[in-house]
A protein has these predicted regions:
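Active-site lining segments that contact anionic ligands and/or coordinate catalytic metals
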Residues: 110-112, 127-129, 136, 168-172, ...
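Generic beta-strand/beta-sheet core signal
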Residues: 14, 63-65, 77, 118, ...
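Short solvent-exposed loop/turn micro-motifs enriched in small/polar/acidic residues
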Residues: 55, 123-126, 166, 199
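Dual-mode signal for accessory low-complexity, basic/Gly-rich regions
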Residues: 141-217, 244
Length: 265
């Protein structure tokens, strides 16, 4: 845009409940106020500690526990100058409110395994035992248990998660840190009504589709500590330099695994 330059503007999004959420609207509203006004400075420091550890890694392995079959390896970008660069963005309510996540764009090559969640709501649709299989960072198989017939399960995912694409890449890996939001959802049993701005902060989550930096990968972004976030591209988004039609999917769907379904790698 000639007149409104992307590198010179930003935005902020926040969500609040409406009375239709139920009889406990006032209580829920007060708790959402609390979620949306948590101490950003505190979360910045806590999340920076997490990022400092992740920046020393080559990959992250996420495993489910109990009935959760998740076993996913997420390949990380390599830092050329750790003193000035970082892999993860420290998200502390300067754009998306509330506070509570660190996220990155994974390297697709080497990202592989199974993502499974027993129940999740995506764009107001429920998925039971959603399972996605990845190889080289792209979906190779998928299923759920919403319907008796497997072809109906696959069509449900194809229509509403893959958005009619044969495959999608893992565009984002994030760790949600907002335990206050997690407890609130459980307390009022409103996990299905939580907007993605809040829901994505309640556990580790994975987005299939475009990265968080789509169409703005060349704009340098920095964490509060001054380090440049270098993980803004993956092997598919880099195709924009030759053919933008091959680089973007026009979708980005966050899938959150609840804390109670996560084990130790």
């Amino acid at each position: 845009n000639r007149y409104i330059k992307g590198e010179e503007r930003s935005f902020t999004i926040v969500a609040y409940p409406v009375p239709e959420i139920g009889e406990r609207y006032r209580e829920i509203f007060d708790d959402v106020i609390r979620i949306n006004t948590l101490d950003a400075g505190l979360y910045e420091r806590v999340q920076q500690t997490i990022i400092d550890a992740l920046d020393r890694g080559v990959y992250v392995r996420v495993k489910g526990k109990g009935a959760n079959q998740t076993d996913l390896k997420i390949q990380l970008h390599e830092l050329n100058d750790p003193e000035k660069e970082t892999i993860f963005e420290n998200c502390v309510a300067d754009v998306n409110i509330p506070v509570g996540e660190v996220f990155t764009s994974p390297v697709l090559s080497g990202t592989e395994g199974v993502l499974h969640v027993s129940r999740v709501y995506l764009n107001e649709l429920q998925y039971i035992d959603l399972k996605l299989t990845f190889a080289d960072g792209k979906i190779t198989d998928y299923t759920c248990a919403n319907f008796e017939k497997e072809e109906e399960n696959r069509k449900y995912i194809y229509d509403n998660v893959l958005h009619n694409h044969e495959t999608l890449p893992l565009g984002e890996f994030a760790i949600g840190t907002n335990t206050t939001a997690y407890v609130t959802g459980k307390k009022y049993q409103i996990e299905d009504k939580m907007p993605i701005l809040i829901a994505e902060k309640t556990g580790p989550h994975f987005a299939v589709g475009d990265t968080c930096y789509s169409w703005s990968e060349d704009i340098k972004v920095y964490n509060p500590n001054g380090k440049e976030i270098i993980a803004r591209d993956n092997e598919i988004s880099l195709l924009r330099k030759e053919d933008p039609a091959k680089a973007y999917f026009q979708c980005h769907t966050d899938i959150t695994i609840p804390y109670e379904e996560i084990g130790r790698a």
